[in-house]
């Protein structure tokens, strides 16, 4: 039987807020007695856009914009009820998207 594991994926445009929230999660989980793996930085997704500056002509005048989406991964091994309760009440900064999944283990 595989031990239960919680996988947390964090996404955001601001890498500082992302690292801050990842460290908050790791500190909270360690205080409850569960084992933590991470935060692991995943590849950054870069979306680039090329836009004409002029509304009509001057095709050579263009502007380039990009959006960088940073990702982090945190795995929690052998979580307890106290761990899950503390994660539910955790206050994280805005602009960070959190995806929580349970992996492995059967009841």
Swiss-Prot record:
GO terms for biological process: translation. Involved in the binding of tRNA to the ribosomes. One of its GO terms (cellular component) is ribosome. This is Small ribosomal subunit protein uS10. Pfam families: Ribosomal_S10. InterPro entries: Ribosomal_uS10, Ribosomal_uS10_CS, Ribosomal_uS10_dom, Ribosomal_uS10_dom_sf. SUPFAM superfamilies: Ribosomal protein S10. Signal peptide: none annotated. Coiled coil: none annotated. One of its GO terms (molecular function) is structural constituent of ribosome. Keywords: Ribonucleoprotein, Ribosomal protein. Gene3D superfamilies: Ribosomal protein S10 domain. Part of the 30S ribosomal subunit. Belongs to the universal ribosomal protein uS10 family.
């Amino acid at each position: 039987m595989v031990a239960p594991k919680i996988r947390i994926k964090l996404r955001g445009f601001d890498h500082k807020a992302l690292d801050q929230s990842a460290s908050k999660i790791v500190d909270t989980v360690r205080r409850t007695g569960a084992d933590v793996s991470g935060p692991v930085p995943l590849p950054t997704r870069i979306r680039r856009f090329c836009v004409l500056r002029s509304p009509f002509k001057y095709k050579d005048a263009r502007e380039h914009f990009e959006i960088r989406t940073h990702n982090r991964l945190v795995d929690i091994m052998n979580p307890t009820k106290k761990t899950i309760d503390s994660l539910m009440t955790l206050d994280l900064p805005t602009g960070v998207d959190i995806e929580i999944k349970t992996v492995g283990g059967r009841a």
